[in-house]
Curated annotation (Swiss-Prot):
Single GO MF annotation: zinc ion binding
Zinc finger (dksA C4-type) boundaries: 73-94
Protein name: Uncharacterized protein YlyA
Protein's gene: ylyA
Organism expressing this protein natively: Bacillus subtilis (strain 168)
Pfam families recorded: zf-dskA_traR (PF01258)
Signal peptide positions on this chain: none
Entry keywords, A to Z: Metal-binding, Zinc, Zinc-finger
PROSITE patterns assigned: ZF_DKSA_1, ZF_DKSA_2
Family annotation (InterPro entries): Tscrpt_reg_DksA-rel_prd (IPR016841), Znf_DskA_TraR (IPR000962), Znf_DskA_TraR_CS (IPR020458)
């Protein structure tokens, strides 16, 4: 394993540890019957879902490194440059990097403090 791949592997191990910690933290919430608690539980359930998805991606990347198939596009079989994988180590296809370009072009709405929906937008 070369230095760049070792660095990616180490980063994935750290990601795994952090995601498992977050999953445990969000899984240990108290059950309450208040309406606000119900909203919080839905938000936590959504967070847990996304954390589990990311954790699965990390575990898959780690297993690919261990069995020697890391760095190859799942669609075409073409190698993916390690420089790109260092940025997005859970990428499974070469097309995964195209999405980051699309996300960078998007902007968030600019809210003025005088907008009526400003406060609501911050908490939705």
């Amino acid at each position: 394993m070369n230095d760049q791949l070792t660095a990616i592997y180490t980063e994935l191990l750290l990601m795994k540890e952090e995601l498992q910690s977050r999953l445990f933290e969000y899984s240990c919430f108290q059950v309450s019957t208040s309406p606000q608690a119900a909203i919080n539980q839905k938000q936590k359930a959504t967070l847990i879902y996304h954390i589990k998805e990311e954790l699965q991606d990390v575990l898959l990347a780690l297993s690919k490194i261990e069995n020697g198939t890391f760095g190859y596009c799942e669609e075409t079989g073409a190698p993916i440059p390690l420089a790109k994988l260092a940025v997005l180590p859970t990428a499974r296809t070469a097309n995964d990097f195209l999405y980051s370009v699309q996300f960078e072009k998007k902007t968030l709405p600019i809210w003025k403090s005088t907008d009526i929906e400003y406060g609501q937008a911050l908490y939705e």
